[in-house]
């Protein structure tokens, strides 16, 4: 197998009484997937949660829909990977009170507590057994790749879940550690919620384990809009690809993803397809973010790119070219005056000596150190006036403050500063 390909659906929200718009979209979805996959081998299909709407019936229509996707993609039911979402559980007063108590006291999961929370997924589990002819596992090992399934909805079920989901750490760890010896395989984690919906301390543990047990990227849904994100907290870059909704409504972006990965280079792409409601057809697009403006986004597995890192470390720096760049930048700068600049000059190494950062950031910082003497030489030369020297830090601070609230991570901040 040279390439790994998959279809990613999410939040399909079957309710049993769909109107024209939803039926029209779903029928067209099947046709579009058939068109895309007609001359390609698809290895698996992902449905990242919310199969039904508000714990509605897992009826014949839902079963027929999933079976049709399986048949179109020419895969077996064993290659259909599904996780539950917050709509796939039964909300009740007992669950609400239990969750409120757990979140308030941050208690350790006891056996009885976990069993009570599991009961609310009974209808979902029964349906999965019917559709796959087996009980659902958390880990599926296939030649060349592995699928790790997470029930991120385990502690969902209130109107205020975001940032409050709690990880059942023992169950999570017992399963993910089975990937410890899978360094040579591609390892994909699948859940319903973005990781940021967990408690902050749980987020850190999830990324640490993703890093230590060879997870390469994470597929999810829930937000009803296509998107992506990158995490470096665990020590290396792990992407998240967030599929949009599979149900037409007033605010959702209806999307599905097609993923492709070269198993030799460990590089590939994810293409997003968006449903146009008025035109009633599919087009490429629907993934938010500058890197996906063309409708597709590059997929690179950081864990396998050691040779690329070595090339960056050995890259020669053209000092004359870098000087010219800085001087051209300075000519275009709009000077910003500050009557009371509150800047306390410090040596750059002193500034960074006490900072805590992961290995990837530290490594990237060290590759940039070679530029510092050049920048100092320019800043201390007679080519810049005192006003110009003082303006540059103020401009950087000003532009940073402008975009700080509009970006979700450091990379986006830099991109927005450069654009401005």
Each model region followed by its residue ranges:
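Extended active-site neighborhood of metal-dependent phosphoesterases/phosphodiesterases
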Residues: 63-166
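N-terminal active-site segment of His-dependent metallophosphoesterases
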Residues: 1-61, 69-71, 75-78, 174-177, ...
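Active-site neighborhood of phospho(di)ester-bond hydrolases with catalytic His/Asp-centered motifs
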Residues: 8-10, 43-50, 78-86, 188-192, ...
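A short C-terminal boundary segment appended to hydrolase-like catalytic domains
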Residues: 261-409
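Beta-strand-turn-beta hairpins that frame and shape the catalytic cleft
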Residues: 1-7, 137-149, 232-238
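Conserved beta-sheet core of the metallophosphoesterase superfamily
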Residues: 199-270
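Active-site-proximal segments of metal-dependent phosphoesterases and phosphodiesterases across multiple
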Residues: 12, 154-217
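Active-site environment of divalent metal-dependent phosphoester hydrolases
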Residues: 13-18, 52-56, 84-97, 157-158, ...
